[in-house]
């Protein structure tokens, strides 16, 4: 199978977690599929939420929702540094007393992911591949909102193959429901053997993978990033590419 890979990075990012009546806005810890599709929609020149009107979905999501992607954090333990940024909001509806209200956002810092896109035989896939290979973006690309410029580099086209083994480390974010747990190597006495050569880590977060067709609210799945060996359950979306194992979703 043909796979488009590129590195996506930025100095800061903000992927807002929906909150009601809150003046501290928190960010998801990673770019998620819906936000990534929005960025790809900007590459293609598709409309967003502001131009949705009465349509079921915003244009970028309607056209790109069936694209299979995989997201691989480019750091050692799955967590980026975070910092609270404070803004002054003096619009009339922000404060019933008419004063200045501080709005706080949690920004991710120095973010970087490898992004994988499974290329199918459709016109949208072909155009997306051509645009990214040639850095021909219709609109400016951002990491969540327009305070956070995104950079794409290291673009390459790779060949992947289905991965059907029962146990493996997984190098991308993957769905928790796709595994049966984690493999524990036994020592000669039948006890779990410790790997003293490295520290194991496990990052888990509920991240948006789709939009609800009526409310357009995020539909989330528990995703994991870890260096532990996993026991695979549903192998249909796992792929081996460049000697790494990733899951498409």
Name the predicted role of every residue range.
Residues 8, 37-39, 107:
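Long, contiguous hydrophobic alpha-helical segments, chiefly transmembrane helices and signal peptides
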Residues 1-3, 66-68, 110-114:
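Extracellular structured ligand-interaction cores
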Residues 13, 25, 54-56, 98-102:
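Sparse, context-dependent recognition of short Cys/His-centered cofactor- or disulfide-binding micro-motifs
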Residues 7-9, 70-72, 116-118:
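Residue-level recognition of well-ordered beta-strand positions that form the cores
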Residues 18-91:
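Glycine/small-residue-rich interface belts in oligomeric ring/scaffold proteins
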Residues 74-249:
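Internal, well-folded beta-alpha domain core
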Residues 1-24:
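N-terminal, Lys/Arg- and Ser/Thr-rich interaction peptides
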Residues 13-15, 45-50, 122-125:
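Primarily extracytoplasmic ectodomains and periplasmic/lumenal surface modules that are beta-strand-rich
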């Amino acid at each position: 199978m043909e796979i488009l890979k590129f590195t996506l990075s930025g100095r800061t990012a903000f992927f807002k977690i929906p909150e009601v009546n809150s003046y501290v806005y928190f960010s998801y810890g990673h770019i998620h599929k819906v936000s990534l599709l929005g960025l790809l929609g900007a590459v293609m020149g598709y409309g967003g939420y502001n131009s949705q009107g009465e349509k079921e979905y915003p244009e970028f999501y309607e056209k790109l929702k069936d694209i299979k992607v995989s997201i691989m954090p480019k750091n050692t333990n799955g967590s980026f540094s975070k910092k609270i940024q404070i803004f002054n909001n003096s619009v009339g509806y922000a404060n019933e007393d008419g004063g200045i209200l501080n709005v706080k956002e949690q920004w991710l810092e120095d973010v970087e992911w490898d992004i994988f896109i499974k290329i199918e035989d459709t016109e949208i896939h072909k155009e997306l591949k051509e645009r990214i290979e040639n850095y021909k973006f219709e609109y400016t690309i951002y990491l969540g909102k327009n305070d956070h410029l995104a950079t794409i580099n290291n673009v390459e086209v790779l060949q992947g193959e289905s991965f059907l083994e029962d146990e493996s480390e997984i190098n991308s974010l993957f769905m928790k429901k796709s595994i049966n747990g984690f493999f524990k190597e036994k020592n000669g006495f039948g006890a779990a053997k410790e790997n003293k050569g490295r520290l194991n880590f496990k990052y888990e977060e509920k991240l948006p993978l789709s939009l609800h067709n009526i409310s357009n609210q995020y539909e989330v799945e528990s995703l994991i990033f870890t260096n532990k060996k996993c026991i695979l359950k549903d192998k249909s979306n796992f792929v081996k590419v460049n000697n790494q194992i990733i899951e498409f979703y």
